[in-house]
């Protein structure tokens, strides 16, 4: 099953365009234009223009799922790189310079709380119809219920795109050695997706075929 997107409805929840645009960029760089076009055809989603606004949630989900179907385990690394690139875009274009400066000079636990609050405020842009909240501050843990970008099914936690976005943001602004570990995933258990941030890092199984972002 390709998971091709249904026709979007006017009232459909939407997700920021980087969920697709940065994935397209990663595919172009690592697999080439022909493979990218194949994934998009499999998803049943047109290539959005670079200046796209918020995109239908179903299209974002379809592209991520089509990539998983087409690339198998290699999709993990590609979605990770897309998440890192999305984090870079947010840092460059969505967080004001003064806010970044304040977060950087604060003690880690305070900077983390400030950044977590900003992420919570704008969570609708990356969870669509899902629900986001800070589950815990010790350790800092994010929770997404009904994550629209989850895999249809998986044997282990597989929300690499979200984990990479969080890791890039907190690694750049708060904890340089941070790693993000998804300890529970809707794709596996049907429950919430839980992401734990380890400020000093933790050895975890990296996504397949991850190269430098």
From Swiss-Prot:
Pathway: Porphyrin-containing compound metabolism; bacteriochlorophyll biosynthesis (light-independent). SMART domains: V4R. The keyword Ribonucleoprotein does not apply. One of its GO terms (biological process) is bacteriochlorophyll biosynthetic process. This is Bacteriochlorophyll synthase 23 kDa chain. Signal peptide: none annotated. Keywords: Bacteriochlorophyll biosynthesis, Chlorophyll biosynthesis, Photosynthesis. Transmembrane segments: none annotated. Coiled coil: none annotated. SUPFAM superfamilies: Ligand-binding domain in the NO signalling and Golgi transport. Pfam families: V4R. It comes from the Bacteria. The keyword Transmembrane helix does not apply. InterPro entries: BchJ (IPR010249), NO_sig/Golgi_transp_ligand-bd (IPR024096), V4R (IPR004096).
